[in-house]
C-alpha cells in the first residue's frame, strides 16, 4: 500500500512537471512526438495513454506495442525520452523484436557518438531481455574498456567462452573490475581461481566482497 501511495505521489508530481514543460515550450518537439505516439497506440491497440508519464509509469502488456514504439524512439531530440520508454516498455524477457531493435539502435548511437548517454539503460535492457542469440553482439559491447558491466555479468552466467578473455582483461580496469570478478565467479570454473583470489585482499570493499563470493561459488562446486 505504501509503495502504491509513493508511486501515486511521484506520478502526480511528474504530470505537473510535464504540464509545466509543455506550457513553457521545454522539449516541445518531443512532446509532439509523445502525443503522436499516444494517438497511434490508442488507434492501433486501444491503449488509453494521454501523457508521457503514462508511458513511463504503465507497461503495455501487448507486445504489438513494440514496433510502434520502436518507430518513435530514434526520433526524440532529448534522448531521455527514448531511454524512459525502453526502461518501461522494452524489458520483455526473450522478446526478439525488442532485442533486434535495441541492437540496431545501439549501433546507430555508436556511429553517431551518442552511445555513452544511453549505456546504462541499454545495459539493463539487454540483461532483462536475455537474448542468447545476441552473444557476439553483446561481447562486442563489453570490448569497450569500461562499458556494459551488467551485460558482462550476464555473459558470465551464460558461461560464454568467447567472452571469457575479455572479462579477464577487464580485471585491469578499475571502473568495471568488480563486475569482472563477479562475472568470472559465474563460470564456476576452478581454473579461474588464480584470477579471482588476489582480490580477496583488495583495499576496496566492493572488490573484496565480489571476490569472496566468486571464490565461494567455485569452491562449493569443487566440494560437491
Feature map (PLM): residue ranges:
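Short acidic alpha-helical/loop segments enriched in Asp/Glu that coordinate divalent cations
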Residues: 100-101, 117
Amino acid at each position: 500500500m505504501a509503495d502504491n501511495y509513493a508511486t501515486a505521489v511521484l506520478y502526480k508530481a511528474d504530470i505537473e512537471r510535464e504540464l509545466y514543460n509543455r506550457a513553457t515550450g521545454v522539449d516541445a518537439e518531443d512532446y509532439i512526438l509523445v502525443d503522436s505516439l499516444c494517438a497511434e497506440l490508442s488507434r492501433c491497440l486501444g491503449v488509453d495513454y494521454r501523457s508521457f508519464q503514462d508511458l513511463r509509469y504503465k507497461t503495455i502488456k501487448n507486445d504489438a506495442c513494440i514496433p510502434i514504439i520502436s518507430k518513435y524512439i530514434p526520433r526524440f531530440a532529448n534522448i531521455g525520452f527514448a531511454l524512459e520508454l525502453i526502461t518501461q516498455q522494452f524489458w520483455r524477457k526473450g522478446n526478439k523484436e525488442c532485442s533486434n531493435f535495441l541492437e540496431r539502435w545501439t549501433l546507430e548511437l555508436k556511429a553517431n557518438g551518442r552511445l555513452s548517454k544511453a549505456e546504462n539503460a541499454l545495459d539493463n535492457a539487454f540483461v532483462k531481455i536475455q537474448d542468447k542469440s545476441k552473444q557476439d553482439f553483446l561481447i562486442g559491447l563489453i570490448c569497450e574498456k569500461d562499458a556494459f558491466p551488467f551485460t558482462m555479468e550476464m555473459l558470465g552466467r551464460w558461461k560464454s567462452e568467447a567472452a571469457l578473455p575479455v572479462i579477464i582483461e577487464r580485471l585491469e580496469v578499475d571502473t568495471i573490475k568488480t563486475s569482472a570478478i563477479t562475472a568470472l565467479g559465474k563460470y564456476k570454473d576452478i581454473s579461474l581461481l588464480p584470477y579471482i583470489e588476489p582480490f580477496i585482499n583488495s583495499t576496496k570493499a566492493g572488490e573484496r566482497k565480489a571476490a569472496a563470493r566468486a571464490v565461494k561459488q567455485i569452491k562449493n562446486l569443487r566440494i560437491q
